[in-house]
Amino acid sequence: MVRDIVRSRILLARPSRQATADDLAIGTDLADTLAAHSDGCVGMAANMIGERVCIIAVLDRNGRPRVMYNPSIVWHEGPYQTEEGCLCLEGARPATRWRRIAVEYQDSSMRARTGRFEGLEAEAIQHEIDHCDGVVI
């Protein structure tokens, strides 16, 4: 189900709790909402749809939403400076990101996974993990 986007900086600045199997439907809604906004958005975190739970969805290289539950960056290299926009905020803001990252997360079956990402996909994952931590760029 496509949900409304939260734009309150106060709500977005609150850290998220860890996701459980009871939160799988939120991940589905998050993927649906990202797909509905894919013309101007490459990733979303659950707090952007009003859920304070650590779930992100990022468009993969094929343009499909990849949902990650409880993502955590476990390796990174190649820091760089960039400017990022956000669907829930106006304008672009400076950010420091890593060119390449490895992320541990759980999939939609709550199985542990590890993935390596680079480029825009890595940048989007870092941005959405910041959302889970209550960091608003």
Question: Where are the model-predicted features located?
Answer:
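Positively charged
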Residues: 1-137
